[in-house]
A protein has these predicted regions:
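Active-site regions of metal-assisted phosphoester/phosphodiester hydrolases
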Residues: 1-34, 82-292
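A short alpha-helix capping/helix-coil boundary motif
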Residues: 2-4, 49-53, 79-80
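A short beta-strand submotif of the Rossmann-like class I SAM-dependent methyltransferase core
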Residues: 37
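Hydrophobic, Leu/Ile/Phe/Ala-enriched alpha-helical segments that form helix-helix packing faces
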Residues: 27, 68, 72-80, 172
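Metal-dependent catalytic neighborhoods of phosphoester/phosphodiester hydrolases
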Residues: 16, 40-75, 93-98, 191-201
Length: 292
């Protein structure tokens, strides 16, 4: 099974439609089964779509005609591929977008779980974050695919990442009672920092799939200065795919490298090939206590 995660930076990119089509062609050419997306934007002012193509739900806001995930699903459909999709809103971005996370799957989606990681913040506050999990059916069983876009470790003196991950870990631990969990996303926390977000996630028992991979291609996912990392020009690994238990990871590759002509976002993507029949029977995830 092939899995892709990407922070799309949608509608903040030039040539956005062309980049959507590039991604759709890649998904088909690489036979990607499940895709976790972040920064899936739509303008709040554009027309609502009454019956979005292949949409399975998950959002508290309506889908608009310029929704990035909808346009991607439509492009895939035009190319002959059918993908179901889900959506969960996080907050208002740049004063004009519904910023969301989404999951696309060519395998059946059997359940959807929106995860509010910031109940103390309102929808118009950038501090509000949400994740989503979708129960995916494979030939050998089901697993939960989750997508998230975390806050920075320190947000104006507030430990937002730790608070968010505590709630996320609790929700994913509930998911893990019924099926394995695969979590992809933009964690806004560099892997080399030993006392920040990456360390917190792995301390809960989540396994970095790159460490399990038989073959790896690339490591860092951001190679230049981006929004939220102003003044930081060093290459860093801030996008990850974690699993709640051991499994066979055949390959783990950085794709659409952000510092290459193939870039379609200000983040690189991660493409994994895993064996969905290889999940260990026991989850390693121990949920964390909510920080105050």
């Amino acid at each position: 099974m092939r899995f892709l995660t990407l922070n799309t930076h949608s509608w903040c990119e030039i040539h956005q439609i062309a980049k959507i089509r590039t991604l759709a062609k890649f998904i088909i050419d690489q036979q990607v089964d499940v895709i976790a997306l972040q920064e899936v934007n739509q303008l709040t002012s554009t027309p609502v779509v009454k019956e979005p193509l292949n949409y399975r739900g998950g959002a508290g806001v309506p889908v608009h005609e310029d929704n990035y995930a909808l346009l991607l699903v439509q492009a895939l459909n035009e190319m002959g591929a059918t993908y179901e999709w889900t959506l969960t809103e996080t907050h208002i971005g740049w004063d004009r977008y519904d910023e969301c996370v989404a999951i696309l799957s060519r395998l059946p989606i059997r359940g959807i779980k929106p995860i509010d990681m910031s109940p103390e913040y309102g929808y118009h506050q950038v501090q509000r974050r949400a994740a989503q999990a979708a129960l995916i059916e494979t030939e050998t069983g089901t697993f939960w695919c989750a997508t998230t876009h975390m806050s920075w470790w320190d947000f104006d003196g507030e430990p937002l990442f730790a608070q968010e991950y505590a709630r996320l870990s609790q929700a994913l631990a509930d998911c893990a009672l019924t099926a394995p969990v695969l979590l992809g996303g933009d964690f806004n926390s560099a892997a080399h920092l030993s006392d920040e977000g990456y360390a917190l996630v792995t301390s809960s028992g989540m396994v970095d799939t790159r460490s399990l991979a038989e073959h790896t291609d690339g490591e860092n996912t951001v190679h230049r200065e981006i929004a939220g990392w102003e003044g930081s020009t060093d290459a860093k690994r801030i996008d990850f795919v974690f699993a709640d238990r051991l499994l066979t990871v055949n390959s783990h590759a950085v794709v659409f490298r952000d510092n290459s002509p193939e870039a379609i976002s200000d983040h690189s993507g991660l493409l994994l090939e895993i064996d969905p029949s290889s999940w260990a029977p026991q989850s390693l995830l121990t949920p964390l206590t909510t920080q105050h």
